[in-house]
């Protein structure tokens, strides 16, 4: 056997057994990712009442906060107001329960509101909803306490190996490229499907798998990224501290101040001020921890307001000081932060246009096709090998009888 033939056998064995062994894990992870590409549209299809808006006009954000607070009752607090990117979609107020040290993640409740009237359309516990379940399953198999995120990351490693070895195995042994694109390379439809679909989706699948690995091991990925590009020091996640109870500004005044500082923009989201995360948020706005030393009096709650530029819909983030009303635009992300952001966007299919979004959707659907056709190919080959072995045994027995 030649060296190339031996190498092909190694890749084939690796490809076959990783595919068969991990199919039960890879397929649901991939399909859940495909569904999440258009999660809002899927949710609207299943729950049309949540999206039954009466128009595209807006009322002051304080009306949405007040309406949501009445609907959710005690135990959770409004934390953010998200405005739709286009007409026909609801305003969503995100409310959070209290965070318990060492306990489960805080409860998250989304309140869907009619933009022109602030009328409550629906109140949804995010983690118990279908979309919330898909998010949790795709991220950590709903078992974060059992290293679910790392398991998903290693599944991504398996998918990356499958996509790369698949390219090698697809390549015609003659070395000619174009003959490999023919439908009739094999006698069976399942084999032709596996080969042809596998070739066209292999590179996008490798890209989505690689970005999924990055997201599956966040701390390791951050360590690697920060070693090659500058990143903002880690701090508390913006907007996830305790909501300030004594805020001087209102959602209306904070939004007005932010809009006045950035002409030509419109509201995307308002995050209510937090009592414990303000320092890290100020540092993030000013580009580092040194800002704290330069302005030690810069303390107290801050409002984080996201605005959309027209016509690109690019997001601009500004901080509004709750005490003084001063507005400060958040600096552009550092190179490492921007690269990490793009890793997530590429994986999600967001911020990249409808073509890539559709391609990402296909990378979630195709593993199901590969699993079905691959198992059929393996089973067919297994039966063929048994048949050949049986015929050899019969032939050997006949020769012995003749002797």
Q: What residues fall within each predicted segment?
A:
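Conserved histidines in hydrophobic membrane contexts and catalytic metal-binding motifs
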Residues: 1-403
């Amino acid at each position: 056997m030649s060296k190339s033939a031996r190498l092909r056998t190694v890749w084939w064995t690796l490809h076959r057994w990783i595919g068969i062994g991990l199919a039960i894990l890879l397929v649901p992870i991939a399909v859940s990712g495909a569904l999440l590409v258009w999660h809002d549209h899927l949710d609207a299809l299943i729950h049309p009442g949540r999206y039954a808006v009466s128009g595209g006009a807006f009322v002051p954000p304080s009306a949405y906060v007040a309406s949501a607070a009445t609907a959710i009752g005690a135990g959770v607090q409004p934390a953010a107001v998200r405005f739709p990117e286009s007409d026909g979609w609801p305003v969503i107020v995100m409310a959070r329960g209290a965070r318990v040290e060492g306990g489960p993640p805080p409860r998250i409740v989304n309140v869907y509101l009619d933009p022109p009237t602030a009328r409550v359309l629906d109140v949804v516990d995010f983690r118990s909803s279908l979309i919330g379940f898909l998010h949790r399953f795709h991220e950590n198999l709903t078992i974060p306490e059992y290293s679910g995120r790392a398991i998903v990351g290693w599944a991504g490693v398996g998918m990356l190996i499958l996509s790369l070895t698949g390219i090698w195995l697809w390549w015609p042994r003659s070395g000619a490229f174009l003959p490999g694109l023919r439908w009739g390379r094999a006698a069976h439809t399942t084999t032709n499907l596996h080969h042809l679909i596998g070739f066209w989706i292999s590179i996008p699948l490798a890209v989505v798998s690689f970005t999924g690995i990055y997201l599956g091991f966040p701390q390791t990925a951050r360590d690697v990224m920060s070693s090659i590009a500058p990143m903002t020091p880690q701090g508390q996640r913006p907007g996830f501290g305790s909501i300030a109870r004594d805020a001087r500004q209102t959602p209306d005044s904070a939004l007005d101040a932010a809009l006045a500082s950035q002409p030509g923009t419109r509201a995307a989201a308002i995050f209510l001020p937090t009592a414990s995360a303000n320092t890290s948020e100020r540092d993030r706005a000013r580009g580092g921890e040194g800002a704290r030393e330069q302005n030690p009096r810069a303390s107290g709650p801050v409002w984080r307001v996201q605005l959309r530029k027209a016509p690109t819909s690019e997001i601009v983030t500004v901080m509004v000081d709750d005490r003084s009303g001063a507005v400060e635009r958040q600096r552009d992300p550092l190179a490492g932060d921007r690269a990490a952001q793009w890793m997530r966007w590429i994986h999600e299919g967001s911020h990249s246009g409808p073509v890539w979004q559709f391609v990402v959707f296909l990378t979630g659907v195709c593993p199901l096709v590969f699993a079905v056709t691959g198992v059929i190919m393996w089973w067919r080959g297994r039966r063929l090998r048994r048949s050949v072995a049986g015929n050899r045994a019969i032939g050997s027995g006949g020769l012995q009888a003749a002797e």
